[in-house]
Amino acid sequence: ASDVYKRQVHHCIARQINKGADYICVADGVILNIANRNPEYLEVVNGGMFSICDSSYVPLYLKWIYGRKYQQYCGSQIFMDIVRMRKYRMFFMGTSQAVLDGLKRNLKIINPDVAAMSFYELPFKHVDDFDYRDIAKRVNKDGADIVWVALGAPKQEIFMSKLKPYLQKGVMIAVGAAFKFYSGLEEKRAPEWVVKAHLEFLYRILCNPKKQMKRCAWIVATLPGLLYSEWRRKHNGKSLIQEI
């Protein structure tokens, strides 16, 4: 993402923190696909402040359909940009305790303020079964400006939409695998040249073939029809996708 685009995103975040609670979705091909097939999930994605493009292919899809230029600003990138700022109090929630411990250990080196911030392991359960009042009570007591959520899509987006009504303040951002990338324990993000070449999906397949092959096969099988349907909606003035 360009510096100008990043500044716009961070300006919106800073402005919202003073207004109240809200959330940002970081949209990749999986989220785009589910949102176009599940009206309730689409409402969740469109119900946040805005969405940013996680996948390098999402801006290409949108350019093909709408003829507009969109920029990629992936979850792991905005995550590290905000951590490096040393500007906000943050709350980290999701994933396993081992990953959270590794994440905290590594982030303290980059931002010493992280040592005094909260890392909360969410129990493994259906998204409808969380005690959102109790979770919000923890976050509100903490006074966090930024709440990082790592539960994986589509669960994390639904989680944020359900938690929002109980929060007094804070911008929630769903960052998926970013916790794992920076914990030093599990999968790492692809090298920069791989990302720029739009080959990150191949890197992820090599690192985790069982999980990623299934996801990629599903996207490849459904994407052509999805793009054509959205193209027709756009030309009929009935697009389901808000501007990202």
Language model features by range: what are they?
Residues K104, E157-Y166:
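Short Gly/Thr/Asp-enriched flexible loops that form oxyanion-binding sites at enzyme active sites
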Residues P59-L60, R189-E243:
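A transmembrane-helix-recognition feature enriched in membrane-embedded lipid enzymes
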Residues G29-I31, L151-Q156, A178-F179:
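Short glycine-rich anion-binding loops that position phosphate/pyrophosphate groups of nucleotides
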Residues L122-V127, G170-I205:
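Short, flexible loop segments at boundaries between secondary-structure elements
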Residues A21, Y88, L167-V171:
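A short helix->loop->beta-strand "cap" motif at the edges of active sites that frequently abuts
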Residues P59-R138, D142:
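Conserved beta-alpha
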Residues V139, G143-W148, A153:
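Proline-aspartate-enriched helix->loop->beta-strand connector
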Residues A1-Y5:
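Short, small-residue-biased leader/transition segments that mark boundaries at the very start
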